[in-house]
């Protein structure tokens, strides 16, 4: 395991499991009607947040999209702040005004997410420009999905970042679908070919290969930080649930069964567990991590829900 110690592997698993359990808790409780905002879950897409957590630096900044819970948590955002935000409480990370798609925690460098597709891409580039002007040694993570690469502002932003040599990393989570429309129906050539003319260093990660993504993230960060240049990392991934909401929508058959089976065999948590087992990390250790995380997530959500119900009672 090149440059990847057992401790890092455990940290990677902890974050991936933490993100998944946090979102599962949201999904399991969503039908109660106490969360009253549209919610885009990233269950199945935990690789990027888990990798980002290994490079945690509160001085590095991040912006994200409508599907931002994982990025927020991976960057170190407050879990009570997230759950309270979903419940519309003043103690939420956006004061209860933003809901699921408008998260922020500047204390860890998470500068915000928005609901409009591609909206935060130029914001991230602006932050990178400010970092360069202030001669700081930081970078900006700009998280986006494959659908956002079809917006004009994406190309304007990577052009400007390349032209001005700005320290930012565009991390594209490509889950193959924009709502129900697959990639082949929307794009006739791969993104890697489209961006060649912009002179930006490009990396591709496939099949939930976390060791590969760790290495590429390491290279991209060193490059962007030292050379003050942008980079693009495209990560092929898969969302387990519907585009927006807590349910599975596989019965709609817009995703091929072979495609679904292939991805179910590439589950990121199972991938990491296999590597943990190879490195003599016991099932007992893994189960202890799971149990501790389950307790934290469940108790935090329950506390948030109780605050919401108390507030609701007072308003009646």
Whereabouts are the PLM-identified features?
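Cofactor-/ligand-binding subdomain signature composed of acidic, glycine-rich
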Residues: 1-36, 58, 260, 275-278, ...
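C-terminal intrinsically disordered, low-complexity extensions immediately downstream
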Residues: 308-316
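Alpha-helix initiation and N-capping motif
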Residues: 6-10, 19, 23, 45, ...
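Glycine-rich ThDP/TPP pyrophosphate-binding loop and its adjacent helix/strand module
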Residues: 110-306
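Cofactor-binding active-site loop characterized by glycine-rich and histidine/acidic residues
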Residues: 24-27, 32-164, 182-192, 197-199
């Amino acid at each position: 395991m090149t440059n990847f110690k057992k401790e890092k592997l455990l940290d990677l698993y902890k974050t991936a499991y933490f993100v998944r359990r946090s979102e599962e808790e949201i999904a399991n409780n969503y039908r109660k009607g106490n969360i009253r905002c549209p919610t885009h879950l990233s269950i199945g897409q935990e690789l990027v947040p888990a990798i980002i957590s290994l490079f945690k630096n509160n001085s590095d900044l991040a912006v994200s999209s409508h599907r931002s819970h994982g990025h927020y948590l991976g960057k170190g955002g407050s879990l009570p702040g997230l759950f309270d935000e979903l419940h519309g409480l003043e103690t939420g990370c956006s004061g209860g005004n933003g809901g699921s798609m408008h998260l922020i925690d500047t204390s860890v460098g998470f500068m915000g997410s928005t609901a409009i597709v591609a909206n935060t891409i130029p914001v991230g580039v602006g932050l990178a420009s400010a970092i360069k002007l202030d001669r700081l040694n930081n970078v900006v993570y700009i998280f986006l999905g494959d659908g956002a690469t079809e917006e004009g502002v994406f190309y304007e932003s990577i052009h400007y970042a390349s032209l001005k040599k700005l320290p930012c990393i565009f991390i594209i989570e490509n889950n193959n679908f924009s709502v129900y429309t697959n990639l082949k129906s929307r794009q006739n050539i791969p993104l890697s070919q489209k961006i060649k003319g912009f002179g930006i260093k490009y990396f591709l990660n496939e099949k939930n290969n976390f060791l590969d993504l760790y290495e590429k993230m390491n290279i991209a960060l060193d490059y962007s930080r030292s050379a003050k240049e942008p980079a693009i990392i495209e990560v092929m991934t898969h969302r387990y649930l519907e585009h927006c909401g807590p349910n599975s929508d596989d019965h709609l058959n817009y995703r091929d069964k072979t495609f679904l089976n292939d991805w179910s065999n590439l589950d990121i948590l199972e991938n990491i567990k296999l590597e943990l087992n190879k490195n003599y990390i016991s099932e007992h250790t893994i189960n202890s991590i799971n149990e501790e995380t389950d307790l934290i997530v469940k108790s935090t959500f329950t506390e948030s829900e109780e605050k919401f119900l108390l507030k609701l009672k007072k308003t009646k």
